Each structure stands twice: as structure tokens, then as C-alpha cells.
Amino acid sequence: NSLRLTLWVLLIVYIFNFLDRQIVNILAEPISRDLGLSDTQIGLMTGIAFAAFYTFLGIPIARYADRPKTNRVGLISVSLIIWSGMTALCGVAQNFVQLLLARIGVGVGEAGCTPAAHSLIADLAPPEKRASAISFYSLGIPIGSLLGMVIGGLVADAYGWRAAFLIAGLPGLALAALVFL
């Protein structure tokens, strides 16, 4: 039962992870129009700003997550606070630099999720159930990506791209508190 509950919580966290990661793609056009960004700036904001920090921080965070005394749940909660807060900050960005810095923050925060989650799953799931457990957790990728596109598009059409970032980011802060409990 503990493993099942943990997997459901981790799945929800991973859905938020990919929702916040992918929402920027559907919002690129209205952001570009509103802030007068070039295609190069959009590419930097949607790609390298996130990916470089996510990639380079993933390995050291994974090493930290694997330490025996690391509080993996706490690491996931802090990561969720960082990426959700930074996603919400994207919604109040007034220029390219602010948006770029917020997207870097999303990458930094999200870098801590998967290593800690995989380490936690490895601790809780017996070897014969680990592959299934990680597969269940990984369902967050397509579900979160889909929700990011759908929610992002619907909210942006109705209320603007800024509201889409706020609606995507702010609930993650509440989720982080629940995860930590």
C-alpha cells in the first residue's frame, strides 16, 4: 500500500513536471507577439535555457539523491516548489531576460525530480516490481505533455499566455506541501 500511494503521488508530481515543461511550447507564439521576441529568443527560451541547466544539474543531483541519508521526498518537494514557482514567474515576466531566467529556474527545479523519484522507487519497490513501478511513474510524461498543451492552449485563448503560466505553476506549490507531508 505504501508503494502504491507513493507511486500515485509521484505520478501526479511527474504530470506537473511535464505540464510545466511543455506548456511553453504552445505559448511561444503569443509570447513572441506580446514581448516582441525573435525566433532566436524563442528558441533560447524554450530550448537551451531549460535544457542546459536541467542536463548539467541532473547528474550531481542524482548523486545527491542516492546518498543514504538524503531525504528524497524533501528533495522532490523543494524541486517542485522551484519549478512551479518559476513557471508562475514566467507569467509575470516583462521581457526576454526575465522570461529566460524563469525558464532556467524551471530547468533547475525539474532537474531534481526524476533522480530523486527513481531513487525513492528503487528503495521502496522490490526488484521484481521496479520496472513496473518506474513505468507507472513514467506515465507522467505523456499525460503531463498532453495536459500542458491542452490547458496552455485553452487558458491562453481565454485569458492570455500569462494566465496559462500562473494556472500551470501555482497549483504545484500546493502539491509540494502535500508531497512533503
Where does each model-flagged region fall?
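Cytosolic juxtamembrane N-terminal segment immediately preceding the first transmembrane helix
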Residues: N1-L19
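Conserved MFS/SLC helix-loop-helix module at the cytosolic interface between two early adjacent transmembrane helices
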Residues: F56-V97
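Helix-loop-helix hairpin linking two adjacent transmembrane segments in secondary transporters
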Residues: Y137-L181
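Residue-level signature of mid-helix packing/kink "hotspots" within the transmembrane helices
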Residues: Q22, F50-I59, A111, S145-L146
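Helix-breaking motifs and short loop linkers at transmembrane-helix boundaries and internal kinks
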Residues: G36, K69-T70, V92-Q98, G109, ...
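Membrane-interface helix termini in secondary transporters
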Residues: P30, I59-R63, L154
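Extracellular/periplasmic helix-loop-helix junction of adjacent transmembrane segments
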Residues: L27-F56
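Cytoplasmic helix-loop-helix junction between adjacent transmembrane helices
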Residues: A102-P142
